[in-house]
Amino acid sequence: MHHQDIVSIDNLKTLPVLRKSELVRLQAENPPLGGLIAGTVHDFNQIFQSPGPIYEPGMVKKDWWRSARALNAAGIGKGDIVQNCFSYHFTPAGMLSEQGILAVGATVFPAGTGQTELQARAASEIGVTAY
């Protein structure tokens, strides 16, 4: 199947499903991205590791992960300070959220996980408006 074969929503039903276990196997056989990209790892700004392990490429571009729409729908935007408690360690969750937060014009406090008392204190002192 080629991208030009997808001309309608109905064509999406014909796309094969790639299961997580298959992705792990492909990446183990052809590290790091399983031969599934049309370039090299050097074409990306970031590489993340998610449980599996699964390696995921990423880019530092405005809303690369397409998370701004959900944040905008939640009313987050310019003037907000968002305490981003997703992990920045290995997984893309922290950067995924951060790029969306920046795309809607809000300020990011990259807090990560843990240290509950410090998190609460920082939220109060910084004036966090979203979590």
Show which residues each predicted segment covers.
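Nucleotide 5′-phosphate-binding alpha/beta core
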Residues: M1-A73, G77-D80
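AMP-binding/adenylate-forming
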Residues: E56-R69, I81-Y131
